Amino acid sequence: LISAIVGTHFAFEHNYVLALFCLMLCGFFDSFDGIVARSKKDRTEEEKKFGIQIDSLVDLISFGVYPAIIAYSMGFKSFPCLIIFIIYILGAVIRLGYFNVMEDMRQQQTTEKRKYYQGLPVTSSCLIFPMIYCLTVCLSVPQAQFVYLIGLLVVGILFVANIKVIKPDFKGVLGLIGFGIILLIILIIKGVVLI
């Protein structure tokens, strides 16, 4: 949550590399909350439910609202852009609400770890949008920021799509973190100034 708040400052300063780095940090920190929660074996039912709810609220801000704020700071302020922001954020809200209901039911039936997600997880935005930005900068795509806006629309729809997405294990999470680091390095090498 703090990373998203700090990143919002960078977005409004038009420092998109640091804003997207903060988005990646949101994903990095989010990848460990489940590990920490599962290490607490003596949690009460209330604590488990609180954890699910607070995690989703933070995810909504960090991965549902914050990427739209970055796009808004890029100058997308027209009515059609507003519609895309609404679709993206509503997709994230619906996805998180659905996840909470399904996760609560799943935890009542089993203690096994979740193996897949229904719909694209909102946390995936922490790599998707930095990747879009990185590719458009590296390939010198004209009007690269429009690609980011289209990405918002597509990802917002995928949040609520009836698809199964495999949940990465610990090695998979480390691989995704490594991928995020590579994205950041590429941006630095291409000469995008961080500050």
Go through each PLM region and give its residues.
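Transmembrane helix interruption/hinge and helix-loop junction motifs
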Residues: 11-18, 75-79, 143, 186-193
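Multi-pass membrane catalytic core of lipid/isoprenoid biosynthesis enzymes
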Residues: 39-95
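Cytosolic, membrane-interface loops and tails of multi-pass inner-membrane proteins
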Residues: 32-48, 98-116
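Alpha-helical transmembrane segments of integral membrane proteins
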Residues: 1, 18-21, 53, 57, ...
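Membrane-interfacial alpha-helical segments at the cytosolic side of multi-pass membrane proteins
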Residues: 5-11, 63-73, 127-135
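Membrane-embedded alpha-helical segments that form the functional core of polytopic membrane enzymes
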Residues: 2-53, 84-89, 151
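C-terminal membrane-associated helical module and adjoining short loops/tails
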Residues: 107-195
